[in-house]
Amino acid sequence: MAIALIAGLASMASALLLELGVAWYVAFAVGAGLSMVSRALMPSPDLGAQMGGRSVTTREAAQSRKIVYGRARIGGNIVYLESTGTDNKHLWLVVAVAGHEIDAYESVWFNDEKIWDGGVYQSGWATAGNTSLSPYVYIGFHKGDQTAADSALDAASTKWTSAHILHDTAYMVVKLTYDRDQFGGGLPNISTIIRGKKVLNPSDNSTAWSQNPSLCIYDYLRDTKYGLGETTDNILTASVNTAKGVCDEAITLAAGGTQPRYTIDGVIDTAGSLKSNIELMTGAMAGRLVYSGGKFEIHAGEYIAPTITIDESQIVGEITVQTKQSRRSAFNGVKGVFLSSEDNYILSDYPAQISKTVAGSFEVGKRYQILTLVNGGSSTDFTAIGASANTVGIDFTATGVGAGTGTASLFLAQDGHQIFLDMALPFTVDNIRAQRLARLALLRSRQQEAITIPCNLSALRFKIGDNISVTNVRLGYDQKVFEVVGYSMGLSSDGQIAVNVEAIETASSIWDWSTTDEEVFLGGGEVDLYDGTVAVAPTSI
């Protein structure tokens, strides 16, 4: 199955490497040779709408199954509905939430109200934590490892029998007892926050729930039911373990504490293509999936100093240079949506990332556009460092580093106006992590220079994503760092076999992140509201 996928993706027969990059990753792949790849991997315009509908309960006869990695809020699909009891006062719902075993249920929501938050079970059932609802709602949880049908539904129903086990399906049985006051508005939308699929860690052969993107991608590659169906022998496990370590690196937070560099929290729709699903998953770690030497390699996003240098001894033809990206490929801001854990996993906008330099760090001789005169401290006198006035939007060439807390944008001055990339993050639920991914996308887009180098066969050792140093006297390159984004086979002008290496400039600085880079995110959180159904005795009378 994997071979067929590779053949379908690698449309050029000469290609020896396959990269499944993430949508935003290839937004920076410039040059005619990469334009086809860029178009193929750009994000779907309706991705944000799809994300927003994941907590909505559906009732479809042929609904696609879902795979949940990390933690997610999901509405599920009603696969069975029946009324029982006197006057049909009891309504039974079977809501399937995942097509596999999950680790745990953490909470249940009716519309926008949390009715259960992991409280005590009673005989395998949970009652609503909401005081007014508790007599009318009972929920039975099944994690997908069940070996028998739900006993309560089996006993109450004449149609649901002991044979209805729903193997390998995580589902809830929800029993609602009719009450005009509680359900006057009709059937509530039912959603649940769950810890999703347990995955294998190849470093110690343990299986447990994890938010590590590398381990979850490894699981999807090996999944014979819904994934790529690859064997372990065809996956370079050393790359899995290395990527796992990168994802687990601790990032310091401005508010104190740390967070893992990358996590994955979201839902894979099995109706989506394997290619698009892998792209979305690798996006959670700013990474890539490479097929090289007969094995898949998983790489998490990080800067690795080059250990290979290309010089005149390896070059067999003229280097093609593109010094600047088109306006369509370059942008100076990144914005988008994510499913915010701070807002109970509803669709939210993460703080937009734009080019910003704080006073004290301006580079003399460079042109900037004023963004703010003050940013939480003393104001900046931009007229003292080359500006004609202290006015937001004015361009100036810095004559000094500046003082105070004012900010200015290098990229806005270069482009003349704001150009945003709209980047949805379907597997990122933390606003700071979303900001880091967006900032990385922004800085990578500003790496303007792309080259195609015809090399001898020694270049066959390169893989997509490798950083290389290039030394060339004519172009003035002295170990200039580029990232390999593609290559093809061809012939040089004198008939030699050539490996045409396509690369784009890169730098370690684009991976830098400081707590001062964090923008304020105004999350809604949870609010306790009086529901009007319980009388509270007055006090202090």
Map each language-model feature to its residues:
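Acidic glycine-/aspartate-rich tracts in secreted/extracellular proteins
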Residues: Y303-I304, T372-F382
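Extracellular/surface recognition and adhesion modules
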Residues: I217, Y368-I370, F382, G393
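Acidic, low-complexity/disordered segments
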Residues: V316, I464, S469-S540
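Long hydrophobic segments that form regular secondary structure
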Residues: Y345-S355, F411-G490
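Polar, S/T/G-rich
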Residues: A2-G8, W24-G283, S292, L339, ...
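Acidic, small/polar-enriched beta strand-loop surface segments
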Residues: H100-E106, D311-K356, F411-V429, W513, ...
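Short, well-ordered loop/turn sites that connect or cap secondary structure elements
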Residues: I102, F362-V364, F462
